[in-house]
Amino acid sequence: MDDLLAPNQGDLEINWQNVGPQNEKGFDNENNYTTIAYNFPGDNTIEELGMSKETKDETVNSKIKWVAFKQQFFSSILIAGNDFQNATLQYETFAPGSGNIKQFHAQLSVPYTPQTDSYGFSFYFGPNKYSTLKKYDDLHLQRLWIIGWVNRWLVIPTFDFLGKYIANYGLIILLLTIFIKIIISPLTYKSYLSTAKMRLLKPEMDKINEKYPKQEDAMKKQQAMMALYKSAGVNPMGGCLPLLIQFPILIAMFRFFPASIELRGKSFLWADDLSSYDSILHLPFDIPFYGDHVSLFALLMAVSVFITSKISYSQTAQAGPQMAGMKFMMLYLMPLMLLFWFNNYSSGLSYYYLVSNIITMGQTFVFRYIVNEDKLHQRMKENARKPKKMSKFQQRYEELMKQREQLARQQAAARNKRK
């Protein structure tokens, strides 16, 4: 290269461009996964250009190891043998219907050394499959695949194990759902038991509400409620905490199905591609935020959400006008929002949530059968008669409540003096 470049040439500029074609049914969904990613040397994380509907560019003024033009299921990756010195990255988004998703640009530089005839680079053109990318662990390419600890240690191993013996991916999703529901069933049972206890306490809670109807008595009412919970051995947050613990699994499933190349092109029942939306009816018009088709899996999933929410609210102790808005949100608005959202999303994900909700309904009926609420109520009464030793947290909480009550009285007295 010495006869082509000046001796004082500092860097070699590499101008890499590519067009990301539309490979999947849904433009918007595929566009969400299409971007430019890069990795810093020695770093086990990756950086991505943020989402933009049109053009996005970024200048990186430090060394990077590789640059990837990433799409939903496939990536083109350029890997430097001795690192790129800096980079200017840009993508431009095509209009829907053009047949393409994004135009990629990467301007990269490597240090030029006179009398050097070759520079080491590697290309990866292949699927965004975790097991394949993991083979290049020293480059951390597997980070291109959307992952978390739940997917890494639970979902992917189970999915791969079932895939060795079962060819039907609809059946694999069914068995995966059953397996996960069995694992979290102790948490589900604990949540149901806590809800049942709160429901049995409702008559006493109603009496406390009647005793302290005024807003200025809110502190006394709260103290009375806490005393009731303590005497009965009930944790008012006991029904929520198990559900919060399950939240990482819900997020993992939400990220797993649309990004798994194993589901790409795999059919089940009326769905011809479990990685994309299913359609049983094409509409002659486009409904804003919904689309121009009807996804049956999304529709059935939304119905199952409504039914499970209905069952859940039928067994809660909460009532009153303050809960009316929450009830409307959970019973009606949430299923409708999910219907609009999932209509253009992975049919495999809608199918998973549908099966999960059906199993939840079955678990609820089983728990109702095995839990004798009369005996449970009797144990709660016996527990209330036993002397209770306050924990340090409860002592501090009670002291805090007394201080807040005293402060409220002082503020009320000050207001009365000013009148």
Could you say what each language-model-derived stretch is?
Residues 250-326, 331-338:
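Long, His/Glu/Asp-enriched segments that create or flank divalent metal/ion-associated functional microenvironments
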Residues 1-142:
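Soluble non-transmembrane domains of integral membrane proteins
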Residues 165, 169, 228, 232-236, ...:
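Loop-to-transmembrane-helix entry motif
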Residues 171-180, 236, 243-257, 297-307, ...:
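Hydrophobic alpha-helical transmembrane segments of multi-pass integral membrane proteins
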Residues 147-210, 241-245, 249, 254:
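Core alpha-helical transmembrane segments of integral membrane proteins
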Residues 222-223, 227-271:
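Extracellular ectodomain/stalk regions of secreted and cell-surface proteins
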Residues 99, 120, 124-172, 266-294:
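Interfacial loop/helix-cap signal at membrane boundaries in integral membrane proteins
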Residues 189-235, 284, 302-348, 355-419:
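Terminal, Lys/Arg-rich, intrinsically disordered segments and adjacent short helical elements
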